[in-house]
Each structure stands twice: as C-alpha cells, then as structure tokens.
Amino acid sequence: MLCIDSDIGWNAQDVLDMLSYDLEFVGGIYPSRQSNIFIFRPYLKEDGSLIVNDKGLFSMEYVPAGFMMLKREAIEKMIAKFPESRFEPKDKELKNVSGWALFNTEIYDGEFWGEDYVFCRKAREAGLEIWVNPLFEFTHGKFKGKLLDALSSRP
C-alpha cells in the first residue's frame, strides 16, 4: 500500500528506493504545511541516540501518512492484532464487502491522536517497525526540506 497526499511534493526515485528496501513499513517525514517544522518522534536507544538500520534509515514511533509504504503482510498483521476493527458497511448492496478501521482518530492517554498517528501506534502494537529515510526531500505548501536537515538544526 502506498499513501501519498496530493499536497506533498516528492521525488519518484524515493518511491523506488522504498520498494528496494523490502521493509514492511517505510516512509518519509515532510515539513508541516503551516510552518517549516517536521513533526516526528523517533525510537531511541537507551543512551538517547537514534536507531539506524543498515540502510541508513531511522526508526520512528510514528510518521505522517502523507508518504508511506506498507507491505500487504504489514496490514495483515494489523488486522490479526485488531480483529475488533472489522466492520460491515451499512449499505446492504455491499453485503460481501467488509473493512477494517485502522485509520481512525481517537483519544489516547487523554490526548487527541490523528488517524495517521493512531495507524502507526497500531502498527507498532502489531509488532511492526517503522522506518524513514532522512534524506528524502519534500515540499508541503510553501515549505521544503528533509528530515536530516531538521535534525541537524536542532540544539
């Protein structure tokens, strides 16, 4: 499954790179549409350093859904972990169609979580690792940048 928001500017080579990584869940982090900031939460080692795999990708707790790729097996793991998310459509004409509510908003620990972050939390709970390439460059609204530059500019 490939998710790309219509207001994100991206490089086609990045999609090919994500395919070549052969990972269950991989994506990119782009600047916010309202300001040139990157919203992310990395998974860190005990010493506070980033977890980086052999491909140079960073482990993340969550990523925005505007640029991510998942294998079918990843979705199947999430469905198996959250069978209660299955639903049947109200429209009886679609009686042989069902779905799973994996992209939904919710209140988690007293805080509102948007659908992309809920999806990532569920992915993590299903045992998936979430990886991002910090070198992918995006535009979003009038802002442009890559995660690595944002990390480099942090104190």
Task: Show where each model-derived region lies.
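Conserved catalytic core of nucleotide-sugar-dependent glycosyltransferases
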Residues: 11-104
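Short beta-strand-to-loop acidic/aromatic patch adjacent to the donor-nucleotide binding site
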Residues: 1-9
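Residue-level detector of anion-binding/catalytic polar loops
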Residues: 7, 24, 129-131
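General alpha-helical segment detector with a strong preference for membrane-spanning helices
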Residues: 9-11, 120
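Short beta-strand and adjacent tight-turn residues that come in two discontinuous sequence segments
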Residues: 3, 28, 133
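Surface-exposed, flexible loop/turn segments at secondary-structure boundaries
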Residues: 9, 33-34, 138, 146
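C-terminal catalytic/acceptor-binding lobe
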Residues: 82-155
